[in-house]
Amino acid sequence: MPERYNRVLLKLSGEVFGGGGIGVDADVVSAKAREIAEIANSGVQVAVVVGGGNFFRGAELQQHGMQRDRADYMGMLGTVMNCLALQDFCEKAGVDTRVQTAITMGQVAEPYIPRKAERHMEKGRVVIFGAGSGMPYFSTDTVAAQRALEIGADALLMGKQGVDGVYDSDPKTNPNAHKFDELTYDEFLSRDLKVADATAVAMARDNDLTMVFFNLEMPGNISRVINGEDIGTTVHR
């Protein structure tokens, strides 16, 4: 792992925004926004992809009989609500931000344009990506990998809720689960690990994008990962 990443894509799940519940937990989002602002103000270029699971999950709605593409679009709109919440708290913490969405909604966000996102980051702004890929059937993990590649990020930081890395089985149900400090992409995929979408990991492998899985709940962990501290699990070639 390098001493310090210069440009990162941070993936935040919707569960983080909800603090484990439905809607937005202002205290939790405010705390993460302060961390992100501190990192951006230190000179690291930061982009964020946010999920919408605290509002809607397309796959779960499908299980209840809803058409999958419509359910996914509902999930995408949920991510935009999270984007706006994070934007507000980041700006209160002292860093300029821009929200870009894959579904056009000019009153609240810019359209997603990779080159424009890069220019924003070069100027010290945090760029927050919402509305997934703008298309159904794509997970937020896959969108995060795609966005990281499009903006030339040094690494994709996968902030996790309730787990501090990648394990060989679910540590919540198996007290003997083994945590990996490092994995290759192929090891991750061959073990069929469920902590991230396989399509996202395959995309990272094919383009040599480092992924770091870490516990987002621990204060200061985002900065620790960016500065090269050995926490979480690094997935690379």
Swiss-Prot record:
UniProt xrefs under InterPro entries: AceGlu_kinase-like_sf, Asp/Glu/Uridylate_kinase, Uridylate_kinase, Uridylate_kinase_bac
Protein keywords: Allosteric enzyme, ATP-binding, Cytoplasm, Kinase, Nucleotide-binding, Pyrimidine biosynthesis, Transferase
Pathway: Pyrimidine metabolism; CTP biosynthesis via de novo pathway; UDP from UMP (UMPK route): step 1/1
Enzyme class: transferase
Annotated localization: Cytoplasm
Binding residues for ATP: K11, L12, S13, G14, G53, R57, Q161, Y167, D170
Residues the record lists as binding UMP: G52, D72, S133, G134, M135, P136, Y137, F138, S139, T140
Secretion signal span: none
EC number: 2.7.4.22
Region called Involved in allosteric activation by GTP, residue ranges: 18-23
GO MF terms, alphabetically ordered: ATP binding; UMP kinase activity
Activity regulation info: Allosterically activated by GTP. Inhibited by UTP.
GO biological process assignments: 'de novo' CTP biosynthetic process; UDP biosynthetic process
Record's subunit section: Homohexamer.
Family: Belongs to the UMP kinase family.
Name by which UniProt lists this protein: Uridylate kinase
